[in-house]
Design a protein with these regions (language model features):
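Residue-level recognition of tetratricopeptide repeat
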Residues: 33, 67, 101-105, 155, ...
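TPR/TPR-like (Sel1-like) alpha-helical repeat modules
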Residues: 119-127, 243-244, 260, 268-287, ...
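N-terminal leader/linker segments that initiate helical-solenoid repeat arrays
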Residues: 19-76, 80, 92-98, 309, ...
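Canonical tetratricopeptide repeat
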Residues: 60-64, 98, 102, 152, ...
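Register position in tetratricopeptide repeats
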Residues: 71, 109-110, 159, 192-196, ...
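Flexible helix-coil transition and linker loops at the boundaries of alpha-helical arrays
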Residues: 49-60, 86-98, 125-146, 174-183, ...
Length: 391
């Protein structure tokens, strides 16, 4: 019994000897946290961690050093203190989101540990969604954190060349934050994807830019992506929007091609197709000749009342027939005087002369009609030049 009493007394003395040390550590932490000067606070917190390894408030001290702005602080310190705080745990969701945001941002800005940065960013969005109804912060703050997490993830994925994943993350971020900068990020990604012939992903990236900012570059590139993906009706709408913003020969040519294909099924689209093809013939150096040829072909094919091609064929046939008649006539009667001809020969000659006259009249008529059709097309060309201000 006496030995037990001595043992209990010794244990009490030992425990009492620990209390000043623990209280001293707690006092140091409280002093550091209540210090108003950021630089002094940082110094005191570092001393606290160095002098009290495994202390009760180690997680909070590391968390504070991660988020605190003080002179001489390096990205490496932000990362080190932040990851230590995350490792120790015990932080509320809001503080954890703040630390994850800072650490992920450091990794992204350095272009290092991008997979980890992406994972941290995803955790931010997930934590914020889970705590949207908590009392730690207003719902608006959690929404901002959801958007920030998605945006950071997009940056990390973009730097790691995972463009498809980056597009998805940026879209999530924009849907929450509505920040115009995200549109520019999506436009840049969309262009990279388009240049890499990833047209479906490019379309996804460019849609928000085209439908929200509506600037020329976004609308035109989005129209190109739609066109590459076979969505010609949607592409046509955005090409027209882009053409209103800037009279580009390339755009006019694309519009003309789409409308010309529609005109093959419905002639009512022919005039509009002609307008854009003729515009392209003057505005697009690369496609000028092809656009003019397409316009000419469409003009004559679509004018059923003119029947230009049919009349050209008739003209060729009449010319050939006239040539044959003339040759036959000359062979039979070219070197003979009329007095030398028999009555039957005179009758035949008269008949051939009548046929020659008929063909000559036919050729004259067809030539006038085809010339009128050509002049009609030329008038379209002149009106196009006038509309575009071309001398």
């Amino acid at each position: 019994m006496r030995k037990s009493a001595i043992a209990l007394l010794a244990l009490s003395v030992f425990l009492c000897s620990l209390l000043p040390a623990q209280n001293s550590g707690s006092d140091a932490y409280v002093k550091a946290m209540t210090t108003p000067d950021a630089n002094e606070k940082a110094r005191l917190l570092k001393d606290y961690l160095n002098n009290n390894p495994g202390a009760q408030y180690e997680n909070f001290a590391n968390a504070e050093l991660c988020t605190l702005q003080y002179t001489g602080k390096t990205p490496a310190e932000t990362i080190r203190y932040g990851e230590r705080a995350l490792e120790l745990g015990g932080l509320d969701a809001l503080k954890k989101c703040q630390i994850l945001t800072l650490v992920a941002s450091m990794y992204v800005s350095q272009g290092q540990n991008l997979a980890k940065a992406s994972d941290y960013a995803a955790q931010i969005a997930q934590l914020a969604r889970s705590n949207r109804n908590s009392d730690l912060a207003p719902a608006a703050t959690w929404n901002q954190l959801i958007g920030a997490g998605s945006y950071l993830q997009g940056q990390a994925l973009e730097k790691s060349k995972n463009y498809r994943g980056a597009v998805s993350a940026y879209i999530d971020a924009y849907n929450v934050l509505k920040n115009p900068q995200i549109i520019q990020d999506l436009l840049k990604l969309g262009k990279a994807l388009y240049d890499g012939k990833a047209y479906k992903d490019a379309e996804t990236a460019l849609k928000i830019a085209a439908t929200n900012s509506k600037d020329f570059a976004s609308v035109y590139l989005y129209a190109n992506a739609l066109n590459k993906n076979g969505k010609t009706e949607e592409a046509l709408s955005y090409y027209k929007q882009a053409y209103l913003k800037q009279k580009s020969g390339a755009i006019a040519f694309n519009i003309g091609i789409i409308l010309a294909k529609k005109a093959e099924r419905d002639a009512s689209f022919a005039d509009e197709a002609l307008k854009y093809l003729l515009d392209a013939s003057f505005l697009s150096q690369a496609n000028s000749q092809k656009a003019m040829q397409m316009a000419e072909s469409l003009y004559f094919l679509s004018r059923k009342d003119v029947n230009y091609n049919g009349k050209v064929q008739q003209l060729q046939e009449s010319n050939k027939k006239l040539e044959n008649l003339t040759t036959t006539f000359n062979n039979k009667f070219g070197e003979k005087e009329e007095e030398e001809l028999s009555d039957s020969e005179k009758s035949e000659m008269k008949s051939m002369l009548k046929q020659i006259e008929v063909e000559q009249e036919t050729i004259k008529r067809l030539t006038a009609e085809t010339q009128a059709a050509l002049e009609g097309f030329q008038q379209l060309i002149e009106s196009t030049k006038k509309r575009l201000g071309i001398q």
